[in-house]
Swiss-Prot record:
Name used for this protein in its record: SPbeta prophage-derived uncharacterized protein YorO
Upper lineage: Bacteria, Bacillati, Bacillota, Bacilli, Bacillales
Gene symbol of the encoding locus: yorO
Length: 65
């Protein structure tokens, strides 16, 4: 199994872009098999929290079934 690389980015109201590049190792992918969308969502929420979004805003982000 290969690594998965993702890039998350956010552009604020002033046009400033903040990016996060992340690589998931095969062991993490295997550990979360069947839950990859949830893993990505959780990491995206942590990314937004690190940018200063409050918990209430971030908690409203959910996946569709």
């Amino acid at each position: 199994m290969k690594c998965i690389q993702i890039e998350m980015s956010f552009t604020d109201e002033y046009g400033q872009v903040t990016r996060l590049n992340k690589t998931y190792k095969p062991s993490i992918i295997e550990e979360h098999k069947g839950e990859i969308p949830r893993l990505l969502l959780d990491d995206f929420k942590r990314f937004l929290s690190s940018l200063g979004f409050n918990e209430k805003q971030v908690s409203r982000i959910v996946t569709e079934d």
